[in-house]
């Protein structure tokens, strides 16, 4: 589990089994995998599966995710999944302040963003982007004393927000600062149950 890290290198590592994901990384910058493999021990391995979920999973990371020269086999899910985490607008306090919440029942209680981050707004029903980007002035949990366990954040911005940013319009918030570039090259993916590679980022892949 990699969180709140920078310039992490995982080289020449073989992972043979995990009850969940093989590698989970979030809120981290620049992750370098070279020869990182999720694989059976060999042709005579008694197991049929390696991980019960994704081999590698990256959520709300930034900088560069570099994954090269790996073998990913016999997973119950993807070899690599890169994505961000949207918040949903729940209340507009004033022209610069919102309450926004995590919506996934298994994904909450961690940092989503920081003062100075840049975000954009998206219509959740059509995936259309609203014009412009906006900078966070301050962000704090609203429903808990700390980020741990929090589902709702109070977010103040440095500039006035579009009039469309209301809960009635079903608006999502994407943190552009915490989106990575991805290089996934010279890897082998085989014998897995689900998909291969998933990249959900507005940056270069």
Which role does the model predict for each range below?
Residues 108-148:
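Ser/Thr/Gly-rich low-complexity blocks that favor extended beta-strand/coil architectures
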Residues 1, 17-21, 47-58, 82-85, ...:
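Extracellular beta-strand/beta-solenoid scaffold signature
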Residues 60-74:
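Repeat-solenoid scaffold signature
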Residues 5-9, 26-32, 63-66, 180-183, ...:
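Short "repeat-start/strand-capping" segments in structured domains, especially the N-termini
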Residues 97-102, 137, 141-165:
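A generic structural motif
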Residues 157-178, 183-184:
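Glycine- and charge-enriched low-complexity intrinsically disordered segments
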Residues 19-25, 41-54, 63, 76-82, ...:
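Short glycine/acidic-rich loop motifs that flank beta-strands on beta-rich extracellular proteins
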């Amino acid at each position: 589990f990699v969180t709140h890290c920078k310039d992490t290198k995982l080289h020449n590592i073989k992972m043979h089994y995990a009850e969940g994901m093989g590698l989970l990384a979030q809120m981290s910058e620049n992750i370098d995998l070279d020869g990182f493999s999720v694989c059976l021990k060999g042709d005579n391995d008694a197991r049929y599966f390696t991980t019960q979920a994704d081999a590698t999973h990256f959520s709300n990371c930034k900088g560069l995710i570099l994954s090269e020269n790996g073998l990913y086999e016999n997973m119950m899910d993807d070899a690599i999944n890169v994505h961000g985490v949207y918040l949903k607008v729940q209340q507009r306090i004033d022209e610069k302040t919102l309450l926004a919440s995590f919506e996934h029942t298994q994904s909450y209680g961690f940092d989503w963003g920081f003062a100075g981050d840049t975000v954009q707004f998206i219509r959740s029903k059509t995936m259309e982007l609203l014009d412009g980007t906006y900078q966070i002035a301050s962000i704090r949990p609203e429903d808990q004393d700390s980020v741990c366990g929090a589902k709702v954040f109070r977010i103040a911005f440095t500039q006035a927000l579009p009039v469309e940013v209301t809960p009635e319009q079903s608006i999502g918030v994407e943190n552009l600062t915490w989106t990575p570039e991805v290089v996934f090259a010279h890897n082998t993916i085989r014998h897995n149950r689900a998909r291969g590679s998933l990249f959900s980022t507005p940056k270069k892949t």
